[in-house]
Amino acid sequence: ALTIRALRTLAARAYATADGIGGGRKGVVHVNLPFRKPLEPIPVETDHADAIDDAGFDYAGAFTVMTGGATIPTVQQMQTLLALLERHERGIIVCGPKSLGENFVSAVAQLSQRTGYPIFADPTSDVRFGGHVQDTAVIGGYDTFLNAPPTWEAPDVVLRFGGVPTSNVLNSYLERIDVKHRVQVSADGVW
């Protein structure tokens, strides 16, 4: 039998997991609660209804505390990425849903300009439109040419930011190309 305290803790953990606290992916949480057949109350000698008042309802603090913080790459990770980008001229940047902060669009545009890598921008990425498209290679209509057999070499590097792109054509292309290096950057750490 679950105690009320255990149920509160379970509810707090389920909420924290669904909210992505602790660096996990935000999303649906499935909770299994064991019930006896036929899902109706059965009197048990050890049940004490008056004990419910002492079950912690007057306790205002949290039974379970989960926290999350900003994920910031280390200096070594940034140096490794920089060395990788300097070694390879052919690459693409894929921006999926859920941009990574208010400065992301300008930062990824600068990255594209410095590396020469075009940006394949998902419609939900916030990168497809804006002032940066005047001087940055932002490609939004990639579905029109990625389905055809490629007449170009596969990129050496694929930098992916955000969630999985919504385009099946782009996802199929990314799966079938032989890439030396794939780098995934996402706010929730999921790849």
What are these regions, as identified by a protein language model?
Residues 10-13, 76-80, 141-145, 169:
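Well-ordered alpha-helical segments embedded in enzymatic catalytic cores
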Residues 1, 182-189:
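Short, acidic/small-residue loops that bind anionic groups at enzyme active sites
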Residues 5-11, 22, 97-103:
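Active-site glycine- and acidic-residue-rich loops that bind
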Residues 2-6, 67-70, 94-97, 157-160:
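Flexible, glycine/proline-enriched loop segments at strand-loop-helix junctions
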Residues 95-183:
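Glycine-rich, anion-gripping cofactor-binding loops and their flanking helix/strand elements
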Residues 90:
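Hard-cation-handling environments
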Residues 13, 17-87:
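Conformationally flexible catalytic loops at phosphate/diphosphate-handling active centers
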